A protein has these predicted regions:
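Iron-sulfur (Fe-S) cluster-binding segments and ferredoxin-like electron-carrier domains
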Residues: 303-319
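Helix-enriched interaction subdomains in cytosolic or periplasmic regions
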Residues: 16-43, 92
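Conserved SAM/AdoMet-binding glycine-rich loop
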Residues: 67-72, 141, 326-371
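Glycine-rich beta-alpha loop elements in corrinoid/cobalamin-binding modules
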Residues: 102-252
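N-terminal [4Fe-4S]-dependent radical SAM core
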Residues: 36-66, 73-74, 239, 244-289
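N-terminal pre-triad scaffold of radical SAM enzymes
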Residues: 67-71, 86-89, 277-301, 328, ...
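Single conserved hydrophobic/aromatic residue that forms the stacking wall/gate
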Residues: 1-14
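Low-complexity, highly charged intrinsically disordered N-terminal segments
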Residues: 65, 70, 76-87, 91-98, ...
Length: 371
C-alpha cells in the first residue's frame, strides 16, 4: 500500500509544471498546473481524484455542493463525518458534491498573489462557482480557518454582505453554512458568518436541504426567499431570521411562520457510506474507519459530543461487518478502526471482532480501537 502511494506521488511530481497563466473564470476549472507546480510543498494534497472517487458531470448537476473541512488535507480528508456526508450527497440524483480543504501557507500566498479563488479538489472549480459551501465546525479554534477559507474563496465573510441575488445568478455567492458539534452546541458566536447552520446529524438533513435548494433554483427565488424556505426544514437555523427578545438574550423568530425553537436532527448511523477515499499522501488517520456507535450513555459533563449526540445508537453488528469487509476490499488498507465515543460500551464488540477475524484471516489486517 505504501509503495503504491510513493509511486503515485512520483507520478504527480512528474506531471506538475511551472506556468504563470491561471484561469480565474467561474465557468471553467482553474489552471491547476500553473497554480500547483513543483514550488508548492506536497502538491498531491491538492490533486484530488483519489482511489475511490467517481467522476461526476458538472453540467448536468442541479445542485453543486462543496463540503470543506477547515484544516489541511492530511487532517480533513480522513475525517469520518466529512467522508460520510460527501458520499451521501453524491448518491442523491441530480446532486454533485466536491471537497475543499485549507491550503498550506505556500499555496494560500500564491492564490492571493494571483487573485485566484480557492478551488475544490475534484472539479478544480473555484469555490464561488458552487451553490452551497459547507464547513464542518468540530472545535472552536477551527473558526478562524473558516474565515481564512472564505477570504481565499473570495466570498464575502459576513452573511449580510452577500446580497440577495437568486442562487441561479452566476454573480450570486454560494450559500455558506456550518455544521458539526461546535456549531450545534453554540451557534451564536459564528452566526454572522453563515447563511444557515445545520444542527445535529447531517445524514438525512443535508439531502433535504439539497431538495429545497434545487426547487428554489428552478423557481428563481432570491437568496432571502430561499433562506425563508430553508428555515422551515427541521434542524436548519437561519440566523438572519431571528432576533433577540426584550431581555436582549433570548432569540425569537422575526416572522410568525418560523419555528420558535430549532431542534437538532438525530439520524441513524450509516456505516456503508464510511468507505473513504485512499489519499495520495499519508493522512492522520491512514486507515479505514467504521462507526459502530453514536452517542454515549455515560453522561460525563466535560464531554461535549457525549452530551450532544444523544440518544446513544448502536449500529447493527452485521452492518458493521459488511462495511469493514467491503471497505477493506475497495481501499486496500491494511488497518481498520471501529469508532465510537466508548467502544467498550458496544455490546456486540466481541462478536463483531471474532467474525471479522474469521472473514479477514487471510488478509493480514490490523484492528485499531480508539482510547
Amino acid at each position: 500500500h505504501s509503495d503504491l502511494r510513493r509511486q503515485r506521488q512520483m507520478c504527480i511530481r512528474d506531471r506538475v509544471r511551472t506556468s504563470d497563466v491561471v484561469v480565474s473564470s467561474l465557468d471553467h476549472p482553474v489552471d491547476f498546473h500553473a497554480l500547483v507546480d513543483s514550488g508548492i510543498n506536497k502538491p498531491a494534497r491538492y490533486m484530488g481524484h483519489e482511489l475511490g472517487v467517481e467522476p461526476r458531470d458538472w453540467q448536468t448537476a442541479t445542485v453543486r455542493w462543496a463540503l470543506t473541512y477547515p484544516e489541511i488535507y492530511e487532517v480533513g480528508s480522513s475525517n469520518l463525518g466529512h467522508i460520510i456526508l460527501y458520499s451521501i450527497l453524491n448518491a442523491v440524483p441530480g446532486q454533485l458534491c466536491d471537497r475543499a480543504y485549507l491550503p498550506a501557507a505556500d499555496l494560500a500566498g500564491r492564490l492571493r498573489e494571483r487573485s485566484q479563488a480557492l478551488f475544490a479538489v475534484e472539479s478544480r472549480r473555484p469555490l464561488p462557482a458552487f451553490d452551497i459551501l459547507g464547513f464542518s465546525l468540530s472545535y472552536e479554534l477551527g473558526a478562524t480557518n473558516i474565515l481564512e477559507m472564505l477570504d481565499l474563496a473570495q466570498v464575502p465573510i459576513r452573511a449580510a454582505d452577500r446580497g440577495d441575488l437568486p442562487l441561479s445568478d452566476p454573480a450570486a455567492p454560494p450559500l455558506i453554512f456550518a455544521g458539526g458539534p461546535t456549531a450545534t452546541s453554540n451557534p451564536e458566536p459564528y452566526a454572522p458568518f453563515f447563511d444557515f447552520i445545520a444542527l445535529g446529524d447531517g445524514e438525512e438533513l443535508l439531502p433535504e436541504i439539497g431538495l429545497v435548494v434545487a426547487q428554489a433554483k428552478a423557481d428563481g427565488l432570491t437568496r432571502s426567499q430561499l433562506l425563508r424556505d430553508l428555515a422551515q426544514v427541521p434542524g436548519v437555523y437561519v440566523p438572519s431570521l431571528y432576533g433577540t427578545g426584550a431581555d436582549g438574550v433570548t432569540l425569537k423568530p422575526l416572522h410568525p411562520d418560523l419555528p420558535a425553537r430549532v431542534l437538532r436532527r438525530v439520524a441513524t448511523p450509516m456505516p456503508h457510506y464510511a468507505t473513504g477515499l485512499v489519499p495520495h499522501v499519508e493522512t492522520v488517520h491512514d486507515r479505514l474507519t467504521v462507526e459502530i456507535r453514536r452517542g454515549c450513555t455515560r453522561g460525563c459533563r466535560f464531554c461535549q459530543p457525549g452530551m450532544l449526540t444523544r440518544p446513544a445508537r448502536d449500529v447493527e453488528p452485521e452492518a458493521v461487518i459488511e462495511a469493514v469487509e467491503t471497505g477493506m476490499k475497495q481501499t486496500g488498507y491494511s488497518d481498520f478502526s471501529l469508532l465510537s465515543l466508548s467502544c467498550s460500551d458496544y455490546l456486540a464488540l466481541p462478536a463483531v471482532g471474532v467474525e471479522l477475524r474469521n472473514r479477514l484471516a487471510d488478509q493480514n489486517v490490523t484492528l485499531q480501537l480508539p482510547s
